[in-house]
Each structure stands twice: as C-alpha cells, then as structure tokens.
C-alpha cells in the first residue's frame, strides 16, 4: 500500500483544528458575565448583590439547539412553553424600605415579597395560556425543588391587566407567601451557572453565611426575542450583619462607629479569581449619596470618615434622573487578581457617620381591622416621606400617582363597594382620588379576586388610608393547609409610582465598557414597593376531634370485649381448683418440718383453704363494662 500523499495528510490534520475553531466560534457567541455590588447600610448592616448574566443568540441551522455556556434546561423551557418574559423569585425576610432605600434601582427591581413570586408572559393564543401556565409551574417545581406546582390551581394565579405590568392579556401572576426558602432552592439555581460555585464570584456563596442574613432573595429573569435570543439574568440579594465583636464600637468622640467589614469577613470565603468562561468579572463598592454629602468627598476612596481596604481600578459617578450625583461606584476588575494576588475588598470606618437612603414617595403598609372570625376589614396606609419637596417645580396643586395591585383568595370575600378613602384624617369620595379601577371578582373555589387601582394623591398629603370590608368564607376540611390555626397568608400588595423612576446615568463610562448590572440600572424602572404579607385568621374545625373519638372508642371497646371474652372462655371450676392447689402446696413444707421435729399436725388445717367468690367478681366486672358501653353508645347517638 502506498503512503498517503502530503496533501491528504494535511487535510486530515486540519480537520480537528477546524472542529475546534467552529466550537470556539459557537462558544464565543454565547456570553457570561458575573458581578457583585457591595454597599454599607445605615443600620450597621451590609448589602451584597450578586448578578450573573448568560446570553445565547437565536438558534441557527448550523448550531441547532446545542449550547456551550448557556444552560440547556432554560433554553428548552423557553422553547417548550413559548415564553417571552419570565421572573421567578425566592425570598426570605422583608425588605426594609424605610432604612435600606426604596427609590434606587437595586431596591426597585430586586426587593421582592416573602415566599415565591412567579410571573410570565407567553407568546401563545389566549386559549392555550392557562394550560401552558399549569405545565410551566410543574416544570419549575421540579427544576428548583420547590412547591411552585401549587400555583397550577386556578385559585392561586390571576391575569392582571395593567396593575402589575402593561400587557395584552398574555400575562399570568401568582405568589406563594408561605413557601420556605432553603439550600435546596439555591443548589439548582447555582447549577445554571457555567462555573457553579466552584470558581468566580459565585464561590463566595457560603450557605451558612447567606442564610443567616436578615434578607435573602434569589431571582431568575428570562427575556426571549426572535432576534436577540435568550437572556438569563440571575441575581441574589443578601443583607448581612457584620460581626461587631471584633471591631471597635465607640469612638473617642463618643459616637458609635459603623462596623468595618470585608468580603472574607462577610462570606467566610476567599475570592481567588474569575470564572474562566466569563467575559467580565467585576466587583463594585457603592458609596451612597448620603455618605458623600456627610463626608464631603465625591470620588475619594480614602477620607477622614472611611477607607476602602484596596484601591479601586476605576471610580464611576452616578447621576439620577434629576441629573444629580446620587452615589459613586468603585470598580475592581477580577482579571487583575489571581491565587497569588487574591482580592478581599472591604470598608474601614474611622469616624462615626449617620446617613439615610433615598426612600420611595410613600411608605405603604397593610394591616387588618376588626375582630372575630366572621368579617373584618383590610386597610392599606400610605405615609409620605416628603420626597415631593425635593422635586423641582412642585406646587400645592400637583399630584402623585400610585398604582395598587392586590390579590385576594376566594375565601376572603371582598366588598369592593365598601371602599373608604381617608386623607390626612378627613374622608374623601372615591371619585376624588380614584382615576381608574379594575375589579375581577373571585369565584368560590375557582379563581381569586383581583383589585387594580390608579390613585392620584395631592403632593401635600402626609397620610392616606384605604379600607375594604370583607367576609370570611368556609372551607372544606380537605382544603385546609397544615397548621391552619396559624391563619391564612394573603400575598403582598404591590404599590408602584409611575411618576418616579430609578434610572441612573454614568456619563464617564466608556462605551466599550460591558456591565449588565449597570445596564439594568440605566433602565427606566418604575419605583415600586411591596407591603407585608397579610395573615387572616379563619374559623377552623377541631382537627383533633376525630383522633380523640377514635382513641376513646377503641379503648372502651377493647376493655369491653376483652373482659367479655375472658369471662366467656374461662371456667370457674378450673379457677377454684387452681386456687386450692396453690393453697395446698405451700403447706407441704411446714408439714414435713413438723414431722421431722416430732410434732403432731392436724391434716384438716393444712388442707382447708378459704373459698374466694371468683365467679361473683367476674359477673360484676362484666356488668359494669356493659353498662359503660350502653351509656357511651347512648351519648354518642344523642
């Protein structure tokens, strides 16, 4: 056989190189970025916001449905259920809007209600949306190891028109306020990352440090278009309490110092480098506007009040929608750090400093009124934060819009005509405050009630209260959840302010600078906030009654039949013979001892034994048990 020609050998050798080139080109179309934002909070806590983005282009004939970085499960989810947008959040704790802020991009987009919240927009005909929603909940339940499948019931989800997000009727929204959040939900969430938690910024997610925080919310958001492909945004927001036992608490001036902290101090983990497949890996330390005003330094990372443990690679100024500097971002690029040069950025406080975060226009609260298990009232209160005074050109005749979305289970029967509005202590007609309202009444055991309202408050208003009366329905015993005596949780109400947005601008940022986190901050997100979960007590049956009846009945029957069968099967003559033998046997030993000693013993005394009335006792016992059984039967029937 002749050896292959040089041209053929070169073609054979170039084939693997060509395959590697095609694979690298396909992988280069998919992108992954990882970012972390750290921020000190006024109440001596620290905020950590992890953000990961995975993007894939639309499938082509060459690439098909194969992925190299993007998670395949998410791609199949989008294609199977025709999803245009989807957002799923798992939250433990409640965001403190008064202290941690309510009008900045981070709180407006990442502060979520307790439990599970899911909404999705489908690219399907209206007739197929509900069935697709039910299948989607089961798929997400298995994917994230949670009870999301409870949202498949028509009594657990709704289709809001404009109170949540403007849509054409293809949006579905549901919430499970009682759903617990644990590591079983975080593990599948991390598996969607190309490096998981083995490398990069995700390696800081140490479970004991994450779940001991005051607030924990993990979110997954999908956006799918025909031209842009699929974009998967994963974010994790945690509020942690730095350990103050090792830090100095009091300053020589008498003030209380903020606790100093670092990444290793917060997460008990070292950051050794970036994820190898990530396009960019950055860490930002945000210094808020309140700190900048008090410290008198705009961009300095070292001043008389605080100092960052590591000099930043870049400093960015943020401008809010009023073109006013709101904060500064100190950037650290992880490509400049490795195992030999690890990064442990933190903040060291030198002087006491008190500041406040930017609040929402109103702090919204919701609570119950009334007493008893038959009826009550739900009150939604608004307390002004005087944010309107900071707006240019505000006058006494101006107004602030507020959109309210509330979901009510079918067993909370709302009387929508009973709406009362009280502003600054005086009652107002609904027509004076309501610009628009949409009500979807609930149907018993079929669908929940939905209330959407567009309110217009005067800028000079300090407080307002909306009151709705309701009746409490009755449930079948099979419809009660575990621990029903605690009460029933009503999902949080959503309050948004269309006149206020939380967008930020970065005029000094390079156009080639790629940061999905800052791109989200640039979007015109409406300022919104969630109220508390409402706990409504309902009349519950005595679930222990069947157990008590069964236990008592079985005990009585066991005593009755046991004694009756014992009396019927036992012979009285055998009992007397057994007693006589028991009395004779102990007397043999004294008789033998007496004969050995030479004493005379009367045999009649040793053989005589007292006759016990055994038969009479048994008859009395059987009669008593029979009387008890008859009395119990009579009382149970009556």
Segments (PLM) and residue ranges:
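N-terminal signal peptide
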Residues: 17-41, 632-638
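Extracellular adhesion/glycan-binding regions together with long Ser/Thr-
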Residues: 194, 427-471
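Cleavable N-terminal signal peptides of Sec/SRP-targeted secreted and luminal proteins
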Residues: 7-27, 624-629
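Proline-anchored loop/turn motifs at beta-strand termini and strand-loop-strand connectors
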Residues: 399-417, 424-426
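Serine/threonine-enriched low-complexity regions used as flexible
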Residues: 118, 122, 126-167, 171, ...
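Short beta-strand elements of extracellular/lumenal beta-sandwich folds
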Residues: 371-408
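Extended, low-complexity intrinsically disordered regions enriched in serine/proline/glycine/threonine
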Residues: 28-362
């Amino acid at each position: 056989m002749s050896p292959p020609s040089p041209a053929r050998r070169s073609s054979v050798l170039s084939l693997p190189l060509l395959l590697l080139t095609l694979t690298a080109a396909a992988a280069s179309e998919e992108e992954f970025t990882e970012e972390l934002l750290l921020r000190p909070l006024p109440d001596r806590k620290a905020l950590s916001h992890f953000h990961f983005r995975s993007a894939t282009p639309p499938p082509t004939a060459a690439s098909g449905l194969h992925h190299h970085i993007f998670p395949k499960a998410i791609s199949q989810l989008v294609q199977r259920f025709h999803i245009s947008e989807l957002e799923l959040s798992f939250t433990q704790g409640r965001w403190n809007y008064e202290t941690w802020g309510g009008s900045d991009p981070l709180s407006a987009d990442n502060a979520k209600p307790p439990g599970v919240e899911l909404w999705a927009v489908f690219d399907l005909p209206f007739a197929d949306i509900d069935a697709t929603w039910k299948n989607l909940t089961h798929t997400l339940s298995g994917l994230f190891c949670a009870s999301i499948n409870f949202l498949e019931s028509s009594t657990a989800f709704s289709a809001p028109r404009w109170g949540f997000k403007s849509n054409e009727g293809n949006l579905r929204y549901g919430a499970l306020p009682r759903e617990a959040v644990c590591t079983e939900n975080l593990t599948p969430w991390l598996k969607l990352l190309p490096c998981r938690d083995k490398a990069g910024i995700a390696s800081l997610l140490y479970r004991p440090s994450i779940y001991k925080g005051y607030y924990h919310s993990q979110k997954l958001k999908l956006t799918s278009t025909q031209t842009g492909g699929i974009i998967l945004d994963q974010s994790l927001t945690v509020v942690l309490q730095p350990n103050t036992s090792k830090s100095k608490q009091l300053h020589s001036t008498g003030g209380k110092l903020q606790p100093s902290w670092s990444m290793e101090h917060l997460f008990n983990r070292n950051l050794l480098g970036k994820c190898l497949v990530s396009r960019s890996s950055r860490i930002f330390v945000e210094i808020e506007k309140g700190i900048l005003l008090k410290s008198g330094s705009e961009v300095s990372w070292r001043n008389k009040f605080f100092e960052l443990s590591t000099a930043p690679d870049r400093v960015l100024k943020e401008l809010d929608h009023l073109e006013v500097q709101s904060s500064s971002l100190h950037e650290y690029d992880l490509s400049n750090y490795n195992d030999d040069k690890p990064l442990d950025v933190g903040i060291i406080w030198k002087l006491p400093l008190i500041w406040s975060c930017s609040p929402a226009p109103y702090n919204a609260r919701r609570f119950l009124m009334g007493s008893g298990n038959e009826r009550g009232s739900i009150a939604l209160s608004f307390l002004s934060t005087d944010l309107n005074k900071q707006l240019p050109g505000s006058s006494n005749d101006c107004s602030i819009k507020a959109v309210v979305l509330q979901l009510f289970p079918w067993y909370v029967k709302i009387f929508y005509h009973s709406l009362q509005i009280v502003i600054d202590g005086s009652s107002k007609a609904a027509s004076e405050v309501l610009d628009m309202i949409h009500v979807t009444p609930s149907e018993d055991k079929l669908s929940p009630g939905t209330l959407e309202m567009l309110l217009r408050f005067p800028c000079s208003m300090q407080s307002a209260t909306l009151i709705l009366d309701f009746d409490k329905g009755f449930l079948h015993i099979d419809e009660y959840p575990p621990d029903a005596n605690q009460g029933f949780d009503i999902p949080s109400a959503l309050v948004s302010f269309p006149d206020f947005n939380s967008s930020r601008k970065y005029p000094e940022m390079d156009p080639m600078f790629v940061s999905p986190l800052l791109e989200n901050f640039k979007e015109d997100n409406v300022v919104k906030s969630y109220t508390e979960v409402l706990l409504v007590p309902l009349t519950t049956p005595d679930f222990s009654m069947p157990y008590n009846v069964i236990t008592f009945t079985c005990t009585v029957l066991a005593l009755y039949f046991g004694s009756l069968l014992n009396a019927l099967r036992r012979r009285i003559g055998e009992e007397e013979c057994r007693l006589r033998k028991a009395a004779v046997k102990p007397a043999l030993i004294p008789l033998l001892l007496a004969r050995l000693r030479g004493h005379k013993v009367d045999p009649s005394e040793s053989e005589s034994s007292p006759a016990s009335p055994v038969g009479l006792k048994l008859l009395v016992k059987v009669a008593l048990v029979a009387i008890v059984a008859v009395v119990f039967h009579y009382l149970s029937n009556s």
